[in-house]
Amino acid sequence: ALMNSTINNNLPILSNEGGLSAYLEQIKKFPMLDAEEEYMLAKNWRTNGNVKAAEKLVTSHLRLVAKIAMGYKGYGLPVNEMISEGNVGLMQAVKKFEPEKGFRLATYAMWWIKASIQEYILRSWSLVKIGTTTAQKKLFFNLKKLKNQIAPQTEGDLRNEHVDEIANK
C-alpha cells in the first residue's frame, strides 16, 4: 500500500480538464528503459524497497497501459477509467516482478494490466446486467455516453436545462 500511495502522488493525472490527449502527451515524456536499466531498478526495488526505482519502472510503462486500454475502447466505458485501472495493474506487476526470472517487465505487466482492465469491465457490466433487458442496457450506455458528453460543460452539476437536453436526445 505504501508503494501505491507514494507513486500515485507522482504520476501524471488523468483528469477531465486536460483530457486524454493531454495525459498521453505527458506520459510520452517518461523515458523507456533498456533491459539492463530495468533489471537494476527492479532489483533495487525488490532488495532495498527503493520507491524511486519502483516509480521509474511504473512511469516508463505508462504508455503500455494506455495502449492496452485503447484496445478495450469498444466496450463503451470511459478510456480514462480503463487507463486508471490498468495503472493499478501495472503497480501490482511492479510490486510482484522478479527480474531474476529473465523476462522483461512489459511482458509480465501486460497480464496484470489486462486483468485489471477486464475486471473493471466485468464489474461495470455486471452492474448493468442485473435485471436488465437488451433495450435497457442500450439505453443505459446511451445515457452514460450523453452524460460524458455533457459533463465537461457542466462540471458534473446537472441543472434542469441539462436534464431536458438529455431527455430530448
Cite the ranges covered by each PLM segment.
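Acyl-donor-binding surface of acyltransferase catalytic domains
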Residues: A1
